[in-house]
């Protein structure tokens, strides 16, 4: 009796707890689904609660109707869609082999599927009929693990028969990755012309040079012996030659081809490609599908900068973050070594390095500008700025590049210059209302924004916007903190102001606060602060993430090799692969690099156009790097 009273008392617990804990909790088991499967398998093994018999090739297989209906659309429609099979104890299954049906039922009860060369085809046929995507994917993956040049056409036919787009894409990828070797086989010439045309048009075609594409196009129609012996007719060029991007071929190769061709459409095409090479200054304005790199590898890239330790070898090396390895690699030597804080812009996948600090025997403002072409690993010196600009910012708006303010180490500047790649010339546009240097800028929605910087000895928190349509500057709301030698990035409809330093504490300190400006609300806010100081950082945006590269930390009293990556969705910073050296003043951007580069050793010295002999001799006499306290920041 006493026990019953105690239990009754427990049942009277208040449903209004006196503390602030949640009234309800939801619990989720991570083991329940597997336990349920094990229980169903035990029922099957024991022959308990079967309620349907599948008749396949005249043989009977007992099963549980509810599990079949839950496993795929085919059985769900059969047993829960109002069909006559809902009431039948025996159901006839057509077009599926008994062995394949056993395989599929084993998967339904266990989530395991054993495939072999002897059963994969009939299992795939059954999975397609019964509409079980997971098994279809497993079969396709298994087939791909056995694909070679001898059986690839058979697998293509299987993919076409069952409309397996994923398998077709995997087969295409196999050929794209092994194109040079595969193009020398008989199976290559048995592919449909439309398929080969599509493959040769792809940016994912893995070749070391465009000449291999040209040869591959010929090998579809001619044998290797005929191609090597030049026993081919190009008066009426094969259609596949339309896919060859002749401007990507080396000029010497094009010239040899041009010289041996008679009057023909192909000769005209080659002549146009030669003109592309000869008009080097105008190449950015001559871009089209046939000048596009065969690559979809967008990489964070850095140029120049100052190292904390003497290094004449690394000072002129550009570096990129290899997305396959997750580490930094060197890929080209710069035409202008020992430069830092250069303005950087990317237009039509050409990199422009504008002005900046010439770090030879001290610091001086630079007016010279360079352009890098990753298609041919080639540098070209473009028209110089009309005046020297150090500690400037550079932005692309539309088809123009803008170099904004800065200083020449005699005066602070307000001048703004605009570069037109079509004419290789600079012209002045509307200047800023006041001088500024060590500011940062970026482009959003067709307008250019600059923030903060210095004027004389004062740190600023100003924000200005340039409208190229009206050639006017507008002043916007001040940012939340003064800073200079920082970076900016545009992401979605917001501007981010990152890093830098100020002397609000009475001495130079890092600014960790990251400010965010909404162009919609025209309001400033703060987001997750930087985990470390980044003055004079490189800034790049890739896949909606902001990369902050190296820089100077005044709190630590040193340059850094840190890389921090901002995730806007999570509002957090992650550590990225560190730079190989502590470096500040790195000019960073995002660039599409050749696919072959990611799989090979660093390139050697690039081709150089309009090399400056005086500048080269000047570099040859350079002593070690300046120490940390001898920097453009003062």
Swiss-Prot record:
<dbReference type="GO" id="GO:1990756">
    <property type="term" value="F:ubiquitin-like ligase-substrate adaptor activity"/>
</dbReference>
<keyword id="KW-0597">Phosphoprotein</keyword>
<dbReference type="GO" id="GO:0006511">
    <property type="term" value="P:ubiquitin-dependent protein catabolic process"/>
</dbReference>
<comment type="function">
    <text>Substrate-specific adapter of a BCR (BTB-CUL3-RBX1) E3 ubiquitin ligase complex required for chromosome alignment and localization of PLK1 at kinetochores. The BCR(KLHL22) ubiquitin ligase complex mediates monoubiquitination of PLK1, leading to PLK1 dissociation from phosphoreceptor proteins and subsequent removal from kinetochores, allowing silencing of the spindle assembly checkpoint (SAC) and chromosome segregation. Monoubiquitination of PLK1 does not lead to PLK1 degradation.</text>
</comment>
<dbReference type="GO" id="GO:0002842">
    <property type="term" value="P:positive regulation of T cell mediated immune response to tumor cell"/>
</dbReference>
<protein>
    <recommendedName>
        <fullName>Kelch-like protein 22</fullName>
    </recommendedName>
</protein>
<feature type="modified residue" description="N-acetylalanine">
    <location>
        <position position="2"/>
    </location>
</feature>
<keyword id="KW-0833">Ubl conjugation pathway</keyword>
<keyword id="KW-0458">Lysosome</keyword>
<keyword id="KW-0880">Kelch repeat</keyword>
<dbReference type="GO" id="GO:0010507">
    <property type="term" value="P:negative regulation of autophagy"/>
</dbReference>
<comment type="subunit">
    <text>Component of the BCR(KLHL22) E3 ubiquitin ligase complex, at least composed of CUL3, KLHL22 and RBX1. Interacts with PLK1. Interacts with DEPDC5 (via DEP domain); the interaction depends on amino acid availability. Interacts with YWHAE; required for the nuclear localization of KLHL22 upon amino acid starvation.</text>
</comment>
<dbReference type="GO" id="GO:0005829">
    <property type="term" value="C:cytosol"/>
</dbReference>
<dbReference type="GO" id="GO:0031463">
    <property type="term" value="C:Cul3-RING ubiquitin ligase complex"/>
</dbReference>
<dbReference type="InterPro" id="IPR011333">
    <property type="entry name" value="SKP1/BTB/POZ_sf"/>
</dbReference>
<dbReference type="GO" id="GO:0071233">
    <property type="term" value="P:cellular response to L-leucine"/>
</dbReference>
<feature type="modified residue" description="Phosphothreonine">
    <location>
        <position position="475"/>
    </location>
</feature>
<dbReference type="InterPro" id="IPR000210">
    <property type="entry name" value="BTB/POZ_dom"/>
</dbReference>
<dbReference type="GO" id="GO:0050870">
    <property type="term" value="P:positive regulation of T cell activation"/>
</dbReference>
<feature type="repeat" description="Kelch 5">
    <location>
        <begin position="494"/>
        <end position="544"/>
    </location>
</feature>
<dbReference type="GO" id="GO:0071230">
    <property type="term" value="P:cellular response to amino acid stimulus"/>
</dbReference>
<dbReference type="GO" id="GO:0051301">
    <property type="term" value="P:cell division"/>
</dbReference>
<keyword id="KW-0132">Cell division</keyword>
<dbReference type="InterPro" id="IPR011705">
    <property type="entry name" value="BACK"/>
</dbReference>
<feature type="repeat" description="Kelch 6">
    <location>
        <begin position="545"/>
        <end position="593"/>
    </location>
</feature>
<feature type="domain" description="BTB">
    <location>
        <begin position="50"/>
        <end position="117"/>
    </location>
</feature>
<dbReference type="GO" id="GO:0032480">
    <property type="term" value="P:negative regulation of type I interferon production"/>
</dbReference>
<keyword id="KW-0206">Cytoskeleton</keyword>
<dbReference type="Pfam" id="PF01344">
    <property type="entry name" value="Kelch_1"/>
</dbReference>
<dbReference type="InterPro" id="IPR017096">
    <property type="entry name" value="BTB-kelch_protein"/>
</dbReference>
<dbReference type="GO" id="GO:0005737">
    <property type="term" value="C:cytoplasm"/>
</dbReference>
<comment type="pathway">
    <text>Protein modification; protein ubiquitination.</text>
</comment>
<feature type="repeat" description="Kelch 2">
    <location>
        <begin position="350"/>
        <end position="399"/>
    </location>
</feature>
<feature type="modified residue" description="Phosphotyrosine">
    <location>
        <position position="466"/>
    </location>
</feature>
<dbReference type="GO" id="GO:0043161">
    <property type="term" value="P:proteasome-mediated ubiquitin-dependent protein catabolic process"/>
</dbReference>
<dbReference type="GO" id="GO:0005634">
    <property type="term" value="C:nucleus"/>
</dbReference>
<feature type="region of interest" description="Disordered">
    <location>
        <begin position="600"/>
        <end position="634"/>
    </location>
</feature>
<dbReference type="GO" id="GO:0005813">
    <property type="term" value="C:centrosome"/>
</dbReference>
<dbReference type="GO" id="GO:0071889">
    <property type="term" value="F:14-3-3 protein binding"/>
</dbReference>
<dbReference type="GO" id="GO:0006513">
    <property type="term" value="P:protein monoubiquitination"/>
</dbReference>
<feature type="modified residue" description="Phosphothreonine">
    <location>
        <position position="463"/>
    </location>
</feature>
<keyword id="KW-0498">Mitosis</keyword>
